Amino acid sequence: MKQKRIALLLALILALSVCGCAADKPQTETAETTAAVENRTAAEGITVTEEELTQTAQWLMEQIPQPTYGSVGGEWAVFGLARSGVAVPKEYFESYGENVAAYTAEHGGVLHAKKYTEYSRVILAWTALGRDAADVGGFNLLIPLADFDQTVFQGINGPIFALLALDSGAYDIPENTAGTTQATRDGYVDYILNAELPDGGWSFAGGDPETDITAMALQALAKYRDRQDVADAVERGLTVLSQQQEENGGFVAYESESSESIAQVIVALTELGVSLTDSRLVKGGNTLVRRLLEFRTENGAFRHIPDGEEDVMATEQGFYALVAVSRAEQGKSTLYTMTET
């Protein structure tokens, strides 16, 4: 099972630095949680309740009592909680801020020599807290993203998350003083477009399109559809996702269905403003949200795979996908748009 998970998440390793972080005991779906899912309006299947958000938020805070710098148990949990509207003790966010500021200062502002998604991830969490990414422990974390060559060094994840981070707070790209290629938004967009596969969609290392990478590319491109080449690529990407979707509403890769893939597609649709009941991504009457909630346990956590254990990483992604849905239902700005309420 662990080997399957490593294979399934190969495309995410450089972006999210994922690792297996499951709780000790497995959870089985109860009659109560099954009924809760089945009782959702069949015509919509997209409702996210305040109780669901609150319960999952509480689970995350219990599992991650001291959030700090890190791809699991760090930025993504803080990011989701900050964007959720759920009541979170101010000390929780303050603790994260202090921990990350101290870590950044201790390392001289260098979070990673090669993997610049580390900067993007922190920028997203920092911005979600209403803070300025130009001052994290006394360091401007936007500066590394001004270096185009270093940002794209790790592949497609680099420009995807650079755009999400820069656009989250409508940040200007600083001047690149490293003597390498100056980054621009159009440059990052072009890199993503040039990486599109012949029949649409994206993957980390070529070959067949991967659900997670395709969905994340669409998230990053969402704000650039005034360019016709972007709009066309987005439509091709949506077609790929539609073709990949299973009859139950989920997605399978490397012989395993994962909640994270569903979560990323949900976020992509909300960023694009595409209805979660769009016929292209409803199979057999099963919506994305309905299927995602079937991975949710009675404690509010999410499983990575249908019969798996409660998992921190899966819950972080499942949670912020539900937050994206909730924000869309309330007419609020999208998950990654933090310049508006």
Where do the PLM segments sit?
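An alpha-helical repeat/solenoid feature that recognizes helix-turn-helix modules
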Residues: 65-89, 110-135, 151-185, 198-235, ...
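Long, well-ordered core segments of solenoidal/helical folds
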Residues: 45-68, 89-112, 134-154, 179-201, ...
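Terminal, non-catalytic domain-edge segments
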Residues: 32-55, 291, 306-341
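Hydrophobic helical h-region of N-terminal Sec-dependent signal peptides
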Residues: 9-15
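Bacterial N-terminal signal peptides that target proteins for export
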Residues: 1-8
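Bacterial Sec signal peptide processing site at the extreme N-terminus
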Residues: 23-32
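C-terminal motif of bacterial Sec signal peptides marking the signal peptidase cleavage site
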Residues: 17-20
